[in-house]
């Protein structure tokens, strides 16, 4: 029996493999603290390892779910929703790549996403950081958001992600929000590198203007503790976004409770990982304050995905043990086995 998961965004080194050696021969049911058939925390023996490499939650929850006959979400708690909303996070800079087509290139991609069933889309912004001259980039960001809203109507959530594209440019970030006010931007993500002072100012400006746009951030923070200054004494980040693989199940569950207590929510970041989407779905199924997942529409040819189905903007999870995935052994042997690494 196997547990399947995904690493982070860098190759696994020999040093990392060496650190994982204590897992060899360990009873999977003793790697975590089990209470009433659920995972209640990390066992003391493996606590440091599992906090350092939180992405191990993926394969370990998959394995433990298969051993116990439970879906991964059921190892976290009761189901809190039957279907899990997902937004399309793949809309990038098509107007830049295909400059002869301009803004309509992005609009067409959004319309395609809506036809697929997505009721929320996230647009890449921040063109003035490096893709275009500063003022031209700001104008294009505004034009893209407003054109998309005109094309899709009021029923689709539009999120904006400058990827820190307004670094050292608070005024530019505010001009962006003013310029798209008519388009009802659902959230602004990573307008600039997170800072208590910066988000205190931005939060105040949004409130004074009577806007409803939320502040989202945190994909580069690896544990719940760094989020605390943004939750207390006043909530400065409305949507916390610790990466689903970087934080794994347990740290993301902990963070969701912190966010919920402050009146916010957690919608974990995910990029370039079909397993990451699936992990997010299992977390959302059991965590009340994780109301939505980021779908990057990734696929992996070596995976057989049996446990989830997308329809009309939401996913349903089948009652399959673990994450509901398996490896296509024929494809693995023909394409990937020669490059495998192992802990020994």
Please provide the spans of the model-predicted regions.
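Metal- or metallocofactor-binding catalytic centers and their adjacent structured scaffolds
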Residues: 2-68
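Metal-dependent enolase-superfamily TIM-barrel catalytic cores that perform enediolate-based chemistry
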Residues: 83-84, 88-205
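Shared catalytic-loop signature of beta/alpha-barrel
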Residues: 22, 26, 184, 195-326
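Glycine-rich, aromatic-flanked loop segments that form ligand/cofactor-binding clefts
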Residues: 56-97
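Extended hydrophobic packing segments that form well-structured cores
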Residues: 323-344
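Conserved, mostly hydrophobic/aromatic
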Residues: 56, 69, 121, 161, ...
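Glycine- and other small-residue-rich loops at beta-strand/loop junctions that grip anionic moieties
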Residues: 6, 53, 137, 162-165, ...
């Amino acid at each position: 029996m196997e547990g399947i998961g995904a690493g982070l965004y860098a190759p696994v080194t020999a040093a990392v493999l060496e650190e994982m050696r204590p897992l060899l021969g360990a009873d999977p049911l003793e790697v975590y603290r089990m209470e009433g058939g659920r995972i209640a925390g990390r066992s003391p023996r493996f606590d440091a390892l599992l906090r350092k490499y939180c992405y191990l939650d993926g394969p370990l929850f998959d394995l433990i779910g298969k051993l116990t006959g439970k879906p991964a979400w059921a190892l976290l708690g009761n189901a809190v929703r039957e279907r899990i909303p997902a937004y399309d996070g793949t809309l990038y800079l098509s107007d830049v790549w295909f400059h002869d087509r301009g803004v309509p290139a992005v609009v067409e991609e959004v319309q395609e996403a809506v036809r697929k069933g997505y009721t929320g889309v996230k647009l890449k912004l921040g063109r003035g950081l490096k893709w275009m001259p500063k003022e031209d980039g700001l104008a294009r960001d505004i034009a893209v958001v407003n054109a998309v809203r005109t094309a899709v109507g009021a029923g689709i959530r539009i999120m904006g992600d400058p990827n820190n594209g307004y670094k050292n440019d608070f005024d530019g970030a505010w001009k962006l929000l003013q310029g798209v006010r008519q388009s009802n931007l659902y959230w602004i993500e990573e307008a600039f590198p997170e800072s208590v002072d910066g988000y205190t100012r931005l939060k105040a400006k949004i409130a004074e203007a009577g806007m409803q746009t939320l502040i989202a951030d945190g994909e580069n923070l690896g544990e719940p503790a760094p989020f605390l200054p943004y939750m207390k004494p006043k909530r400065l980040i409305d949507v916390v976004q610790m990466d689903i693989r970087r934080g794994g199940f347990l740290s993301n569950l902990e963070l969701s409770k912190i966010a919920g207590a402050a009146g916010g929510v957690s919608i974990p970041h995910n990029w370039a990982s079909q397993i990451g989407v699936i992990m997010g779905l299992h977390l959302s199924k059991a965590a009340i304050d994780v109301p939505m997942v980021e779908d990057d529409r990734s696929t992996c040819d070596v995976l057989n995905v049996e446990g989830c189905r997308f329809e009309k903007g939401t996913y349903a999870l089948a009652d399959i043990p673990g994450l509901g995935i398996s490896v296509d052994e024929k494809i693995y042997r023909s394409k990937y086995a020669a490059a495998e690494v192992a802990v020994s």
